[in-house]
């Protein structure tokens, strides 16, 4: 691609389940689509999803599913978003994942789909591919996206900023027009050159922001780029205080935030203290199957009471299943660090896992900025309220990704802005090489600050300290960014500090504890 860039009908930024669904939906309508990803698609949150994807099980109904979602979300869910998911989701699972992509979901001896149960669900309704569901879904989607004649796949590119009118327009008269997204400035990670990707409609599907925390189940690429770009472009962002912490991530220095799926507890595993006591009984009737926020706080409190950096998840003593067969990925990962989970309990800690807030969208994925759609974790549909029910993230990505792709095509305008109408990327006259020591230390500051001051349990004083420290750092990072020779690391750092502040500001502004946002004061 030349520095002048390219033009397309629809630009999709990201290629997890939401981005891939959107790309296929738009391309199936006969439109040209560019899919932009900053790293190999195997680093998406979809790829790492173990537990499964919710649908409707036996003796189940949309109303029951919806009740579980609303209960987990502390009643702050958008009822219309819940209705869309429980009515459209099961149909799209069948039509796209099973019939079209052939995802090999686990089946029972009778050949029927095997349904698991997870925390917060009143029925067994979780489809899974053993414990590698996300990997199987992502591989199937990638094969379909890469082979589609109307989709151009750009891997190893970093989205720097969204292109908008009037902000990036050469035409001064454009300031009288309604703000509109026109695509994105994109950095070729190999050459470190920036190109304009002009699009008549743009769909953000960049995933979440767990990697702004010290402990996370997300890949390190999950720094919230989409939130930051949408915020700078003027799109409305909501509910950023609702950061869900997964209760059980493997506690081991070599584990890299490996997630121990809630399905493990669904199959009977119990949380126990380091001296062998079960403790979830005192935190509510659902015990180990309580919603994630309750379990995460219970573990956090138990760690404080026992002065231990972890608790134990005992699968071997309580689950009546063939552990290596049911959880092959978890079994192998634990074995690799010296744990035989058929005999030993698993040391676990809570970790930042999912953002329930994001770029506000309607039922079709439209944001408040014309020309911009969003789907998946980067979007806030209102579905999750204050806390997400287990195994609904993949389903939400599938539903809103498909809807956003179709809706973007229906809004395509004739003509559009030409690349010549938009400013070229400005390179500093004397760009400085990026010092990795500065990048690493700035990230350590962000992640430690967020974990200690804006984590599982928050107070006004902690959040005010986080705000002050992060604001100071943001000014330094912005100066660093303006003077540096552009590369993916400095772009990512700029996105990350912006997102950390968005979370902190939202948490400070909301004194009411609900779901994943817990204020001790």
What does each of the following model-derived ranges do?
Residues 1-10, 28, 179, 189:
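Extreme N-terminal leader/targeting segments of oxidoreductases
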Residues 6-8, 25, 29-31, 40-43, ...:
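Glycine- and aromatic-enriched mobile tails/lids
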Residues 10-35:
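N-terminal Rossmann-like FAD-binding beta1-loop-alpha1 element of flavoenzymes
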Residues 161-191, 339-383:
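FAD-site-proximal beta/loop scaffold in flavoenzymes
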């Amino acid at each position: 691609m030349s520095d002048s860039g390219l033009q397309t009908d629809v630009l999709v930024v990201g290629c997890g389940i939401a981005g891939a669904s959107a790309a296929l939906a738009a391309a199936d309508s006969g439109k040209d689509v560019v899919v932009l990803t900053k790293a190999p698609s195997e680093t998406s949150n979809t790829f790492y999803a173990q537990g499964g994807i919710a649908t409707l099980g036996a003796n189940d109904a949309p109303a029951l599913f919806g009740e579980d979602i609303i209960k987990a979300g502390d009643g702050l869910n958008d009822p219309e978003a819940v209705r869309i998911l429980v009515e459209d989701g099961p149909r799209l699972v069948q039509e796209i994942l099973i019939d079209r992509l052939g995802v090999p979901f686990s089946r029972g001896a009778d050949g029927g789909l095997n349904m698991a149960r997870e925390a917060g669900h009143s029925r067994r309704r979780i489809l899974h591919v053993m414990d590698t569901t996300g990997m199987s879904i992502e591989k199937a989607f990638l094969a379909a996206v890469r082979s589609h004649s109307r989709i151009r796949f750009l891997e190893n590119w970093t989205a720097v900023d969204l292109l908008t009118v009037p902000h990036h327009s050469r035409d001064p008269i454009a300031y009288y027009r309604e703000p509109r997204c026109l695509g994105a400035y994109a950095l070729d990670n190999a050459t470190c050159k920036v190109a304009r990707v002009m699009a008549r409609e743009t769909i953000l599907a960049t995933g979440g922001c767990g990697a702004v925390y010290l402990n996370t189940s997300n890949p390190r690429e999950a720094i919230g780029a989409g939130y930051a770009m949408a915020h700078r472009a003027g799109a409305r962002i909501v509910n950023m205080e609702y950061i869900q912490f997964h209760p059980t991530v493997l506690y081991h220095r070599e584990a890299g935030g490996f997630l121990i799926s809630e399905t493990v507890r669904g199959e009977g595993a119990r949380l126990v203290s380091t001296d062998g006591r079960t403790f979830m009984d005192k935190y509510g009737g659902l015990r180990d199957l309580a919603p994630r926020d309750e379990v995460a706080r219970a573990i956090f409190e138990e760690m404080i009471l026992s002065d231990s950096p972890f608790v134990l998840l005992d699968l071997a003593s309580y689950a009546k299943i063939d552990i290596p067969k049911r959880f092959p990925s978890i079994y192998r990962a634990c074995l690799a660090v010296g744990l035989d989970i058929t005999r030993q309990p698993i040391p676990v800690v809570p970790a930042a896992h999912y953002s329930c807030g994001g770029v506000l969208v309607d039922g079709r994925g439209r944001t408040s900025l014309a020309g911009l759609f969003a789907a998946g974790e980067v979007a806030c549909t209102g579905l999750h309220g204050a806390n997400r029910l287990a195994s609904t993230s993949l389903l939400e990505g599938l539903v809103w990704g498909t809807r956003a792709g179709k809706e973007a095509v229906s809004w395509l305008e004739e003509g559009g802005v030409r690349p010549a109408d938009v400013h070229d990327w400005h390179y500093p006259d004397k760009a400085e090489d990026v010092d990795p020591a500065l990048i690493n230390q700035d990230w350590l500051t962000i992640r430690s600050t967020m974990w200690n001051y804006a984590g599982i349990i928050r107070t006004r004083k902690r959040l005010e300290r986080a705000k002050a420290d992060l604001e100071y750092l943001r000014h330094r990072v912005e100066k660093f960014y303006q003077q540096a020779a552009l590369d993916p690391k400095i772009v990512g750092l700029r996105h990350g500090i912006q997102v950390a502040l968005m979370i902190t500001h939202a948490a400070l502004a909301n004194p009411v504890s609900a779901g994943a946002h817990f204020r001790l004061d």
